[in-house]
């Protein structure tokens, strides 16, 4: 039987874009990258685990903030080069800025306007972690 991971069209860096959506509202929470190991672990542990390109290592979403993403469903697009994670966002905050979604700016009149409130101060979220970005 063909390995389900072999069906994915990984990019030149061995990564696939992963979009996290709220499983109840459908709101897009964030986009990150996954390598083969991250996607396999996400499926086996039923929680979002990404690949941090900046840190060059696995990033277990919520490991510093507590804002874990519990996996409800995993979907693959028609070209097999993007995955969607339907998740329960623990704490209601996906973004390191303390907002529900990383997509909190809307293009209006030629400029990006911030439209979503900060739900929790990022310093309070990461005070025990030693840095500001998960």
Curated annotation (Swiss-Prot):
Pathway: Amino-acid biosynthesis; L-histidine biosynthesis; L-histidine from 5-phospho-alpha-D-ribose 1-diphosphate: step 3/9. Its EC number is 3.5.4.19. Keywords: Amino-acid biosynthesis, Cytoplasm, Histidine biosynthesis, Hydrolase, Magnesium, Metal-binding, Zinc. It comes from the Bacteria. It is found in: Cytoplasm. It is an enzyme of class 3 (hydrolase). Its cofactor is Mg(2+); Zn(2+). InterPro entries: PRA-CH, PRib_AMP_CycHydrolase_dom, PRib_AMP_CycHydrolase_sf. Its main location: cytoplasm. It catalyses: 1-(5-phospho-beta-D-ribosyl)-5'-AMP + H2O = 1-(5-phospho-beta-D-ribosyl)-5-[(5-phospho-beta-D-ribosylamino)methylideneamino]imidazole-4-carboxamide. GO terms for molecular function: magnesium ion binding; phosphoribosyl-AMP cyclohydrolase activity; zinc ion binding. Binds 1 Mg(2+) ion per subunit. It holds the Pfam family PRA-CH. Zn(2+) binds at residues 78, 95, 102. SUPFAM superfamilies: HisI-like. One of its GO terms (biological process) is L-histidine biosynthetic process. Mg(2+) binds at residues 77, 79, 81. Belongs to the PRA-CH family. Catalyzes the hydrolysis of the adenine ring of phosphoribosyl-AMP. NCBIfam families: PRK00051.1. Homodimer. This is Phosphoribosyl-AMP cyclohydrolase.
